[in-house]
Amino acid sequence: MSLRWLGPVVVFAGLAAIGFFPRNHAQAGEVSSITHYKVLAPIRHGNLTVFPVVAATTHDTRDFLTLDEGLRSGDVVVTEYSNLQGMVRRRQPGGGEQRSNRAQVNTLVLVNNSKRPLILLAGEIVTGGKQDRVIGKDRLIPAESDPVDLGVFCVEPGRWTGSSDKFNALGGPMAQPAVRAKAMSDKNQAKVWEEVGKSRSGMMAQVTAASPALAATSSYARVMDNKEVQEKLDSVAVPVERDYRSLIQQLREHNAVGVIVAVNGEIIWADIFASTDLLQKYWPKLVRSYAAEAVGTHAKAQQADEKTAQAFLDNMEGRHQTVESEPGLYRQTEISGDGFKAFELTSLLPKTIFDLHVAKMAE
């Protein structure tokens, strides 16, 4: 049995000024002819502030599949490496058989049987198997793919026994920004575990009487799925989600495509998509991840303003750039600048050559 690993090409470049967003700074409330993005008045609840972002233009993303959609339809299959038998679509010329009698830590494989390319976002949590795991980077999986390495980090230290042979991300959590940042930027399992521990402790501190089962679990997903934790998250996420969904409907013709996130008045994150439709598909997961960051963070509440949010979005001048590419499929660009890192996922598929998602984190 042969296994086709889609191997990206990685290019490093040290540059003085790099930007997939152009370098001028738009005034808050004005659409820049260069950046094409405008930050709107914020939605606030507690210590969480979300700034809607609208675009001058958007793209048709109907040809792309999300992980939730693929799992729901059964077109996408996720399994441990040891369960590959029978999943390979075709043999490669001269390819030998590759077998494994046991699962390998952090090695999941995915098959996309759909006729649409699959979007994977860093931070999506896949539960089941030997451990719960988080996807480590944004990427595209081609339509009707052979098994590919999913590229994950464990978010459940201490367990390496099967809870279920079935993997699921449908309706599951998106890791909060602090955990996403460790997976995307540090790319280090120990640092991911460390941040999971901090996030888990911060969340449990908000639960008045944590159950013994909750206190005993090392699973990030199970903590987030706890009833009392859910109530805490709902108290922040539901009002913000409701207000933003209403705003999206009102601003659909103005191309609402993303958000900038502040916690305790400090800008921490931005998620920008190629279309309103794509944003709406991820919004329920995203807003709860932002709420988890806010609920688990203790600091004196301040307020970020539109000008600060617009400046954060516009500043894409970088000292260093890393480009990872699977020719003809996608390109991921990582930009390191003063006080931030940004990650741009660009489709290279015919007729859909545009940025699908941009994630930007404050450092």
Language model regions located:
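Bacterial N-terminal signal peptides
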Residues: 9-19
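Bacterial N-terminal signal peptides that target proteins for export
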Residues: 1-10
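Intrinsically disordered, low-complexity segments enriched in small/polar residues
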Residues: 19-118, 123-363
